[in-house]
Structures are given as structure tokens and as C-alpha cells.
A protein has these predicted regions:
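Enzymes that bind and transform nitrogen-containing heteroaromatic metabolites
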Residues: 1-141
């Protein structure tokens, strides 16, 4: 444990620890785990593993994604070094065009775009660029 955080060696170990911390039964049913939240915070390979699996310990599969979208005010290309997997969004009728290993998702809430007062994004040259951000909540269909 470091500063109140628990380090674990794998996604499975983290989900078992989340279940135990919530006091859910070891042999939990879907009703037992419905009230237990676990936040999976990347990197990109951890997101990819979590989204593609249907056998996550104590949780089964990821049902909700909360993500932050960013874009640079100046329009500069911000490359970054970690990417979350692409999510297939449903159309207004609730249909997805293609099958995705990460499932089909619908946006259930989205905040208005805001101008960050203190945050910035670095472009390829290392220049600080003002940014906008928005929060989205997605549910698996």
C-alpha cells in the first residue's frame, strides 16, 4: 500500500481486491456485484484487456465507461503516448454498423465542452496549448 493506494500485479488481482474492499461475497451473483464499482485506470493495454473480456473476476465485463475527451484550442496535433481502445458507438436507433471486440456503446450523458483554466496539452514540439474538455458516460448495449 502506498499513500492509501494498493499496488497489484494484474487486472484480475485488482478486481479481486475491489470486490474484497466492497465486502462482496467471494461467489458473488450479478445482483451482488451490481452495487460494486471498480474504476479501471489504464494504461492503454489495461483498458484494452478490460473492455475485451467477458470473464472479469467478480464483475463479468465492463458495462459502463466514463471518459474525458480533449481537444486543442489551436487545432494543433496532440499525439499523446497512451490510447484507450476505440469504442463503437451506436446510431440513434441503437444499432452498431460493425462488430467490435470491445462491444457496442451508447452515450448516456455528456457535459458541455469547457475551456480548461489551468490544463494544457503538449504538441509534438513540446509547446503548451490551451485545451477544451468534455466528460462522457457510455453504457454497453
Amino acid at each position: 500500500e502506498r499513500d492509501g493506494a494498493l499496488w497489484v500485479p494484474s487486472l484480475d488481482a485488482a478486481l479481486y481486491a475491489a470486490r474484497d474492499a466492497a465486502g462482496a461475497p467471494v461467489e458473488a451473483t450479478p445482483a451482488d456485484t451490481a452495487a460494486v464499482d471498480a474504476w479501471i485506470l489504464g494504461g492503454g493495454s489495461v483498458y484494452a484487456e478490460a473492455l475485451s473480456r467477458t470473464d472479469l473476476p467478480a464483475f463479468g465485463r465492463v458495462e459502463t465507461v466514463e471518459r474525458t475527451l480533449f481537444y486543442c484550442q489551436e487545432g494543433n496535433e496532440i499525439t499523446g503516448d497512451t490510447r484507450a481502445p476505440e469504442l463503437q458507438l451506436a446510431d440513434s436507433a441503437g444499432n452498431c454498423e460493425v462488430s467490435s471486440p470491445n462491444g457496442c456503446w451508447r452515450v448516456t450523458s455528456e457535459s458541455a465542452w469547457e475551456n480548461s483554466e489551468k490544463g494544457y496539452l503538449l504538441d509534438e514540439s513540446g509547446t503548451k496549448n490551451p485545451m477544451y474538455f468534455s466528460f462522457q458516460r457510455l453504457e454497453r448495449l
